[in-house]
A protein has these predicted regions:
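A detector of single, family-specific signature residues
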Residues: 1-267
Length: 267
């Protein structure tokens, strides 16, 4: 469900809880239609979350302004330990009316699709790494050590020639090898799909330009652009670095300036 709160346009206007509605397109349409009957200009906002941008796109297509708010940047009162959907909705309505909320950049469906594809490949890489670590740990526990570079053709031949006294251990070895082969095939398949999708992507020229940097191959460049989106939304490099979390943290007061490690604000 969605908790809905309303704030009147003036700063001293009333703020009240409207209702709880189902999280469905039909319920959202009925809500927007009913609120539009007063003739007022409607401005919606909601926290970014697992439901994505469907609500924003539906309301925008209907002609309404809708902002997706970054949860980590919502101002909160110190000591406020009570969190409910109703309180969150009322707080968002007040802050949105005051202009105190920070909206996230909303990608178009094509950009979101490329980003999902890139993230799927990253998940495949993590799965492959985990499978390799599991096999390495298994072999280490049973006294098998390979002194040369791992995961090469020679290393695979060495794995295929291993023998164990216990048949169950050999079953585990074969299962680990099969898992690694499946994860490798998944990673390579998604990599090829990324290369294919880039041919028709609007930001493909930016990806190719980024590859002029040393050490930046196609997949890395596509990942950066897919996550950043439209770079022109940043007024200067300082804003971009702050978004990425590559600027130092700071706790300064008066004439004293203290800087710490980077903020790591990005993903």
């Amino acid at each position: 469900t969605i908790a809905v709160a309303l704030a009147e346009g003036s700063q001293r206007g009333a703020v009240c809880e409207h209702r709880q509605i189902s999280n469905t397109p039909a319920a959202l349409t009925r809500l927007a239609t009913k609120l539009s009957q007063t003739g007022s200009v409607l401005r919606f906002c909601y926290e970014a979350g697992p439901c994505g941008y469907g609500i924003q796109r539906q309301l925008t297509a209907a002609g309404h302004d809708c902002a997706v708010v970054a949860p980590s940047l919502i101002p909160r009162k110190p000591g406020d330990r009570i969190k409910t959907d109703r309180r969150d909705a009322i707080n968002l309505a007040k802050l949105h009316r005051a202009g105190a909320l920070t909206a996230v950049w909303v990608p178009d469906p094509a950009h979101e699709a490329v980003r999902d594809l890139v993230r799927a490949r990253l998940a495949a890489v993590r799965s492959l790494r985990q499978a390799r670590q599991q096999l390495s740990g298994f072999l280490l526990r049973h006294g098998h050590h390979y002194s040369r570079p791992a995961w090469t053709l020679m290393h695979r031949r060495w794995l295929a020639g291993l023998r164990f006294e216990q048949p169950a251990h050999h079953i585990v070895l074969e299962d680990c090898i099969a898992t690694i082969e499946a994860a490798t095939a998944r990673r390579d398949r998604l990599t090829a799909q990324i290369e294919t999708m880039l041919e028709n992507w609007a930001l493909a020229p930016v990806v190719h330009a980024l590859q002029s940097l040393r050490g930046m191959a196609l997949v890395s460049a596509a990942t950066v652009i897919a996550e950043l989106g439209d770079i022109t939304r940043f007024a200067n490099p300082r804003q971009l670095m702050a978004y990425l979390g590559l600027v130092p943290s700071e706790h300064s007061s008066g004439g004293t300036r203290r800087q710490g490690g980077i903020t790591k604000a990005g993903n």
